[in-house]
């Protein structure tokens, strides 16, 4: 594969599925603030004029679900009926129940260190040295375009923008290295008064150019800005939204495998979330240590069992030390039991709402992005 193209997409915080993710994680954070040992599995559905919050929650905390939901939608920017969705007037339905005692008996143990996994499943983590945050470039820059869209919308630079938007970036590779950007797609909701030519010029100048490195852009790069020409009806009025429906956007943009489990609304006892974060942490430290240029970790668990049922390390032929050394380092320096990874990454804190838009990985504010084990791994592997 001497030459190839690779594409990843992102969506804005105002995309219906991301509204749902943010509400679910806002509920999780509010509960963890009061009760760090709570069991939370919160799902959200949004559609024109309505939000439904459901799931299974066992906690001593009390949270005003309706007000929390409205505040989350308000922060995103849906504050007027002209946008098709209004935080102040939408209906909020609460259908939350309690976690099954059959699950509790497998997770909760007398010795917290032996806490079992909340479910069976497979989780993947990935890192590569393609960007400074050790993430694939296509998803990294797709997210940054969406972050920029939100910034210029909220600070008044482009006041006619609305919250719903999507981006997609296609990178050109030769011999596995980036040589340019082949195509950029950006669709953004807007008010009715802006013309398509004015919108396209403003998006190019205020969103695309400030984000994408000029050395990767050339006269052959193709731009598709609101290619249908009109995007006034958006958000929950245009499409219904559901928690957990943007799992590739949330992770590696398709550049790595995915176990299928979503993240938002789940407390750290759910290994769908916590073990995926731990797998990213392991992979990132391996790459940061110089043990490999690319690394993918797979973990698997059985419900009620503490130790992973399997650990897989894949370095795609880019390893700089023996594969056996890398595997031994993972086993020796990373505690991948549910309790161990919660402690290792300090996961029992209200940090999850911020993860629910613009990706869970490649953002240094999150503990699973630390490379604090890299020096230890280098020493173990004898890397100078």
Swiss-Prot record:
Catalytic activity as recorded in UniProt: L-methionine + ATP + H2O = S-adenosyl-L-methionine + phosphate + diphosphate
Flexible loop: annotated span: 99-109
Compartments it resides in: Cytoplasm
Molecular function GO labels: ATP binding; magnesium ion binding; methionine adenosyltransferase activity
A biological process from GO: one-carbon metabolic process
Cofactor detail note: Binds 2 divalent ions per subunit.
The keyword Transferase is assigned to this record: yes
Cofactor section: Mg(2+); K(+)
Keywords: ATP-binding, Cytoplasm, Magnesium, Metal-binding, Nucleotide-binding, One-carbon metabolism, Potassium, Transferase
Source superkingdom: Bacteria
Entry keyword annotation includes S-adenosyl-L-methionine: no
Principal localisation: cytoplasm
Pathway(s) the chain acts in: Amino-acid biosynthesis; S-adenosyl-L-methionine biosynthesis; S-adenosyl-L-methionine from L-methionine: step 1/1
Main EC class the enzyme belongs to: transferase
Position of the signal peptide: none
One CC-aspect GO term: cytoplasm
Binding site for ATP: 15, 164-166, 230-231, 239, 245-246, 262, 266
EC number(s) on file: 2.5.1.6
Binding annotation for Mg(2+): 17
Sequence positions that bind K(+): 43
Residues annotated as transmembrane: none
Family in the record: Belongs to the AdoMet synthase family.
UniProt xrefs under PANTHER family: S-ADENOSYLMETHIONINE SYNTHETASE (PTHR11964)
Complexes and interactors: Homotetramer; dimer of dimers.
Function: Catalyzes the formation of S-adenosylmethionine (AdoMet) from methionine and ATP. The overall synthetic reaction is composed of two sequential steps, AdoMet formation and the subsequent tripolyphosphate hydrolysis which occurs prior to release of AdoMet from the enzyme.
Listed name of the protein: S-adenosylmethionine synthase
Provenance organism: Vibrio vulnificus (strain YJ016)
Phylogenetic placement of the source organism: Bacteria, Pseudomonadati, Pseudomonadota, Gammaproteobacteria, Vibrionales
Gene designation: metK
């Amino acid at each position: 594969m001497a030459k190839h193209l690779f594409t990843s997409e992102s969506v804005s915080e105002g995309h219906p599925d991301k509204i749902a993710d943010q509400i679910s994680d806002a509920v999780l954070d509010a509960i963890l603030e009061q009760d760090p040992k709570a069991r939370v599995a919160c799902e959200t559905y949004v559609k024109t004029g309505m939000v439904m919050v459901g799931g299974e929650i066992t906690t001593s905390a009390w949270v005003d679900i309706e007000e929390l939901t409205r505040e989350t939608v308000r922060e995103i920017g849906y504050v007027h009926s002209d946008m098709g969705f209004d935080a102040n007037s939408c209906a909020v339905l609460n259908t939350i129940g309690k976690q099954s005692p059959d699950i509790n008996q497998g997770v909760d143990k007398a010795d917290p260190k032996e806490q079992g996994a909340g479910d069976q499943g497979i989780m993947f983590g990935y890192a590569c040295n393609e960007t400074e945050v050790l993430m694939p470039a296509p998803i990294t820059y797709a997210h940054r375009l969406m972050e920029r869209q939100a910034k210029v919308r909220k600070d008044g630079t482009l006041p006619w923008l609305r919250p719903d938007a999507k981006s997609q970036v296609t990178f050109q590779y030769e011999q596995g290295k980036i040589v340019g950007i082949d195509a950029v797609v950006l669709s953004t909701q807007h008010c009715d008064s802006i013309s398509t030519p004015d919108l396209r010029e403003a998006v190019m100048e205020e969103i695309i150019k400030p984000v994408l490195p000029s050395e990767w852009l050339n006269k052959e790069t193709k731009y598709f800005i609101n290619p249908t020409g009109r995007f006034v009806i958006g958000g929950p009025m245009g499409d219904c939204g559901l928690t957990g429906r943007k799992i590739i956007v949330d992770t590696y943009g398709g550049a790595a495998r995915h176990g299928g489990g979503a993240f938002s609304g789940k407390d750290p006892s759910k290994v769908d979330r916590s073990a995926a974060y731990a797998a990213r942490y392991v992979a990132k430290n391996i790459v940061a240590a110089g043990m490999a240029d690319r690394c993918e970790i797979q973990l698997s668990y059985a419900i009620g069992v503490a130790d992973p049922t399997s650990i897989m390390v894949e370095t795609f032929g880019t390893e700089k030390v023996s594969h056996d050394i890398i595997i031994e380092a993972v086993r020796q320096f990373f505690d991948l039991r549910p309790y161990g990874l919660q402690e290792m990454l300090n996961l029992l804190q209200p940090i999850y709402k911020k993860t629910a838009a613009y990706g869970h990985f490649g953002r240094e504010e999150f503990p699973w992005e630390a490379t604090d084990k890299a020096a230890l791994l280098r020493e173990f592997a004898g890397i100078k």
